[in-house]
Design a protein with these regions (language model features):
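Terminal low-complexity tails and localization/encapsulation signals of metabolic enzymes
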Residues: 2, 242-254
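C-terminal long alpha-helix characteristic of the crotonase
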Residues: 122-127, 178-224, 250-254
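Glycine- (often His-adjacent) and acidic-residue-rich active-site loop
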Residues: 55-89
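CoA-thioester-processing core
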Residues: 107-160, 190-194
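Glycine-rich beta-to-alpha transition loops that act as phosphate-gripper elements at the mouths
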Residues: 101-107, 161-165
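Well-ordered beta-strand positions
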Residues: 119, 159, 163-165, 171, ...
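Conserved CoA-thioester-binding segment of acyl-CoA-metabolizing enzymes
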Residues: 1-56, 75, 89
Length: 254
């Protein structure tokens, strides 16, 4: 069974793995429509034994659609941030296994999106992984930071977010963000196989272990938006200047 929800293709692979494929040219840049479609697809897959996040392109996601979100006023940006944060919680708290197949770059919001998976499998090659928000004059949102603390620990999350460097797949594996690197032609098969393997565990036991392991992180995640200065940074003079410069470069390349 397959379905297309706007910018996300949904397919039940082999009867047990719900494959959600990001399909937004170009670069799967994250805008409100993609967030809404992905949230809808995740909700529709709630009963699936396992969930797989994939991409129709040679990369996973280049992050937020800056030329679009740059035009948002504070209220619209606040809604977008709230919806993106809700998506991250829905992925991170999904009670079945969630695997992400990363064919290439996962940058900024794209890396945050991938962090919602239980395991991340990347293709060999020149893909880069990083949190580049600091280069734009903004920190990553507090709620998202809690997920990186869960994956990398306090020091690892700080180094990734504060340095703003993009790293190779090999380095991301060494850091503990990636779980496996495979040849690109094998990526989808390996990721589906891993999701199916995890789905073969007791669903109730797997869900209980996830709840125990993530309870503290989710509690901090739910408190994180209160007093988060992200929007103050986003609308600061420094950030606006940096974002405008990047958007100008992106527009010129297009």
């Amino acid at each position: 069974m397959s379905a297309v929800t706007g910018l996300v293709r949904s397919e039940i692979h082999g009867g047990d793995v719900a494959v959600l494929t990001l399909d937004r040219p170009r670069a799967n840049a994250i805008n409100p429509a993609l967030v809404a479609d992905l949230r809808r697809a995740v909700a529709d897959a709630a009963g699936a034994p396992a969930l797989l996040l994939a991409s129709s392109q040679g990369l996973f996601s280049a992050g937020w659609d800056l030329p679009t979100v740059r035009t948002f006023g504070r209220e619209e940006m606040s809604r977008f941030l709230a919806d993106f944060t809700a998506l991250m919680r829905e992925l991170f708290s999904f009670d079945g296994p969630v695997v992400a197949a990363l064919p290439g770059h996962a940058i900024a919001g794209g890396l945050i999106l991938a962090s919602g998976a239980d395991e991340r499998i990347a293709a060999e090659g020149k893909g880069e992984f990083g949190l580049s928000e600091v280069a734009l004059g903004v920190p990553i949102p507090r709620a998202a930071y809690e997920i990186f603390r869960y994956i990398l620990g306090d020091r690892g999350a700080e180094r990734l977010a504060a340095a703003g460097d993009n790293v190779s797949a090999v380095r991301a594996l060494e850091m503990g963000f990636l779980d496996r690197i495979v040849p690109g032609e094998d990526l989808l098969d390996v990721a589906v196989g891993r999701a199916r393997q995890l789905a073969g565990r007791s669903r109730a036991a797997y869900a209980e272990i996830k709840r125990r392991a993530r309870a503290g992180t989710l509690a901090r995640f739910d408190r994180a938006s209160d007093g988060d200065p992200f929007l103050d940074f986003w609308f600061s003079e420094e950030a606006r200047g940096r974002i405008d410069q990047l958007v100008a470069r992106l527009t010129k390349k297009a």
